């Protein structure tokens, strides 16, 4: 959702040297991801109650979005419910398929 995407943008902008923003038109035909700003990378966000489903489904969608965007890399950010004493940003996980990870480290 919008709130989670804004949160992810703020965290990535804080923790990386890049200015990350929400992509206009996310979710439309030929989707190219939810966020922009990390070079050559498609970023998909998921803030689902069923985080296991998000971990399985969203990286597959991110891969199609990577192809649509003609980018080299795709990552999925999955937001988990904050736990007590959770550090700033620690309720997010970066998820990739094995193929996506292999492409990243080549």
Describe the residue ranges of each PLM region.
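Catalytic phosphate/metal-binding cores of nucleic-acid and nucleotide-processing enzymes, i.e., regions
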Residues: 1-106
